[in-house]
Amino acid sequence: MAALHITDIEAAINYWRARKPSPDGVTLAPEIRALAEVYALMVFFHEDEADARGFPPKAWDAWLQWYDSTPDTPCIAICSTSQGDEVCKGCGRTFEEVQLWPGMDPVDKRATWRRITLDGTSWRFNRYAERAAEGQAGPEPAAAA
């Protein structure tokens, strides 16, 4: 079962809060409202993950737009799987994940990202952290209208 972790939903909410801040401190942008409904249910039912099947369409669209703003791959161009390692020392993905990455769906990619981030032992998190794409400055959010 492919599932979205609550931390990704939080990150998507914060992404939209930066891009579409509340004009009055109360009103939420449609993307935030859609994601917040899912988040609230997860908190209420003490769930860490939401099944991707049946995810509300507006929340899914908002989540996908956030996902598109994240680095696609954890690769830092030091792939030890090409030398026979089962797990890449550079990014922390398994040989199979490296091979199948282009065809994986966003939810499965985010699950892999979560696993390697929690593990935190690959070189992208220490020795070669400067190579990590998420450490680079991205475009500024649009100003509120």
PLM regions: where:
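N-terminal acidic leader/helix
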Residues: A2-V26, T73-S80
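Amphipathic alpha-helical interface segments used for dimerization/assembly
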Residues: I9-I13, R17, L35-A36, A40-F44, ...
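Short, charge-rich amphipathic interface segments used for partner binding and complex assembly
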Residues: A29-Y67
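Short, charged low-complexity linear segments at domain edges
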Residues: L64-Q83, P141-A144
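Local cysteine-cluster metal-coordination motifs and their immediate loop/turn environment
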Residues: I76-E97
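Short cysteine/histidine-rich metal-coordination sites, predominantly Zn2+-binding motifs
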Residues: R93, G103-W113
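Short Cys/His-rich "knuckle" micro-motifs
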Residues: V98-P102
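Short Fe-S-cluster ligation motifs
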Residues: T112-G138
